[in-house]
Design a protein with these regions (language model features):
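Extended, low-polarity transmembrane helix blocks
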Residues: 1-35, 58-66, 77-168
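Membrane-interface interhelical connector segments
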Residues: 2, 38-56
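Conserved short histidine dyad/triad with adjacent acidic residue
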Residues: 69
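Conformational-control "hinges and anchors"
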Residues: 72
């Protein structure tokens, strides 16, 4: 597909282009976060974090679980996407440094292949943002409409204010 063809895509396709990365990264992070926050998952991860030398393990497991859960929900909704993407990049950098980096690239051998893919998606969202089909965009559009309505009445408000100033 040529660059010319990509630039001629309908606006809805351009707007929808960031949905698959947001939804895939978000759902993955939600699942990983919930796994750390469930009782049996927390206990398993506490033992694992202690083996890695991350102490105190329980607070770090809970913080990681909450971070992954919130980052996932944010990515899915397209709200606070850039901070969520940054949080994913940090968690994946730690996962690569502490767990997967020494095992090479191949994910079947415990390598960092999957973490690198998640990091690439997160980096794209960090740079590009959530796109037009997002809660952030909807809230921004709502705020822009509200501001336009406010500005439309501004001259009348000024006249009323001047009248009140004259009346004392």
């Amino acid at each position: 597909m040529s660059a010319m063809m990509l630039s001629e895509q309908p606006d809805i396709l351009k707007a929808a282009a960031l949905l698959p990365p947001r939804l895939s990264l978000g759902s993955t992070m939600v699942v990983h976060g919930l796994a750390k926050l469930r009782k049996e998952g927390t206990e398993t991860h506490v033992g694992f974090f202690e083996q890695l030398g991350i102490r105190p393990a329980r607070p770090f497991v809970l913080a990681t679980g909450v971070t992954e859960l919130l980052a996932g929900v944010s990515a899915i909704l397209g709200f606070a996407t850039r901070p969520a993407a940054l949080a994913v990049l940090v968690t994946q950098a730690v996962a690569i440094a502490k767990v997967h980096g020494s095992k090479g690239f191949d994910v079947t051998k415990g390598g960092y292949e999957f973490n690198l893919a998640l990091s690439a998606i997160a980096l794209g969202l960090l740079v590009r943002g959530p796109g037009r089909l997002s809660v952030s965009e909807a809230l921004g559009e709502w705020a822009r409409r509200r501001e336009r309505r406010r500005l439309r009445w501004l001259p009348r408000q000024r006249r009323a204010s001047r009248t009140l100033d004259l009346l004392g």
